[in-house]
Design a protein with these regions (language model features):
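Short, hinge-like loop/turn segments at secondary-structure boundaries
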Residues: 62, 125, 292-293
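Flexible glycine-/small-residue-rich
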Residues: 18, 60, 82-84
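Glycine-rich phosphate/pyrophosphate-binding loop shared by adenosine-nucleotide-utilizing enzymes
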Residues: 65
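Alpha-helix C-terminal capping segments
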Residues: 59-61, 266-267
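Ferredoxin-type iron-sulfur electron-transfer modules in oxidoreductases and energy-metabolism complexes
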Residues: 27-41, 69-183
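Cofactor-binding beta-sheet edge motifs in enzyme active sites
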Residues: 2-17, 22-29, 42, 48, ...
Length: 394
């Protein structure tokens, strides 16, 4: 974990260029820790700590380096480039745009390092073949296994570089959704977990504000049976902003956008008006949900049903507080009536992934937050004789 070098880390500082700006940083601190903890460049991701996974890849004088294996003093006087510098003009670099177009990111954790390695590759070989791509990315591990799409993204980046007049993609992070709240100022939370409370007893409006709530209760689950996921609710406010709940959703497979589209189609509202509330994991800042593949078959139909029922009782008036509990089986819209699906929506969070703006639990910082780390002895069989834990009691 970054940030653990100790109280003497700032005794001596050196100057290095980071994204074109001269920075004075502690000489003995790891480059990874300095970039993240000192400069707030959290697009550089901690991973294995041994230079094996590539999630912390940066460019040093244009060449890929694992930041976890370098001290700041190693890059004194050199030019360090992180993912944050690529889209600083407000539009995506062609490599980033290619990753978005192809959908080359899934969870997005390895993506900043991948993008920088591809950038260095194209600087050396403008039109690489698959073998050259594989060799260049050998130091970057994708835990989700999206390597075929990453290769296609590299070829697409070459095409974008050869095309004149191609409009660059907007680099605005999370452009099609509104924030659920900052971890340091979290949104209101239920007084009692809603999955342990009957729908009519939940404090809907204290948490979500005035509006219409439609609930599809969970079906009784037979012992030993597979969950049907047939439980969902949504809230529509006076401005036609919709919050929908489906339990946990996938990350990276774009089910989040697909589930939002179901709601948008049924309610005839823009996709940007719909946000998803994940289940219990939504209480963890920057949590990415679950990594399965059953979000759509488990949750999709139930979500479409609550949206279809909501459509029959709209419009919503300002100041309205109304809860509708579904007892029948609402008729959902046929796919032939859809207007927004299939029209080229950018996958949820993909721009965040390629720009380094996507946040994970390891990126959370709070006032007074302490860091822990495993400190290994320099000699085999060494024994800890003394520990200064005074800072922990401050």
């Amino acid at each position: 974990m970054d940030g653990y070098e100790g109280s003497n880390a700032r005794v001596h500082e050196v100057t290095t260029l980071v994204n074109g700006v001269a920075r004075s940083l502690p000489a003995t601190m790891s480059l990874l820790s300095a970039l993240r903890s000192e400069l707030g460049l959290t697009g550089v991701k901690p991973g294995c700590g041994e230079g094996a996974c590539g999630s912390c890849t940066v460019l040093v004088d244009g060449e890929p380096e694992h930041a976890c294996r370098r001290r700041v003093c190693d890059v004194e006087g050199h030019d360090v480039t992180t993912i944050e510098s690529l889209a600083c003009t407000g539009t995506l670099h062609r490599v980033q745009q290619a990753f978005v177009e192809i959908g080359a990111a899934q969870c997005g954790y390895c993506t900043p390092g991948m993008v920088l390695s591809v950038l260095a590759l194209l600087a050396r070989i403008p039109n690489p073949d698959d073998a050259a791509i594989d060799e260049a990315l050998n130091g970057n591990v994708c835990r989700c296994g999206t390597y075929p799409r990453i290769r296609r993204a590299v070829h697409r980046a070459v095409e974008l570089g050869a095309q004149s007049g191609t409009e660059a993609m907007d680099a605005t992070a999370a452009a099609d959704r509104w924030a659920l709240g900052d971890p340091q100022s979290p949104p209101p939370r239920p007084s009692r977990p809603w999955d342990m409370t009957e729908p009519e007893d939940r404090d809907w409006f204290e948490v979500l504000g005035d509006g219409l709530v439609v609930v599809l209760p969970a079906l009784p689950l037979a012992p030993g049976s597979w969950s049907t996921g047939a439980s969902a609710w949504l809230h529509v406010d006076a401005d036609a902003k919709v919050t929908a709940f489906t339990g946990k959703v996938d990350v990276g497979q774009d089910n989040c956008t697909a589930l939002r589209l179901l709601v948008a189609e049924e309610l005839r509202v823009p996709l940007a008006n719909v946000r998803l509330a994940m289940g219990d994991t939504d209480l963890c800042p920057y949590d990415m949900g679950t990594f399965g593949s059953r979000s759509m078959p488990d949750a999709g139909h139930a979500l479409a049903q609550v949206a279809a029922h909501a459509r029959t009782v709209l419009p919503v008036g300002a100041g309205l507080r109304r809860v509708e509990i579904i007892t029948g089986a609402p008729v959902v819209m046929a796919g032939t009536e859809w207007r927004q699906a299939g029209t080229g929506h950018v996958p949820e969070g993909m721009v965040d992934a390629v720009t380094g703006a996507r946040r994970f639990a390891s990126d959370l910082t709070l006032p007074g937050l302490r860091y822990g780390a495993v400190l290994r002895p320099h000699v085999l069989g060494a024994t800890l004789r003394e520990l200064d834990a005074g800072a922990l009691s401050d």
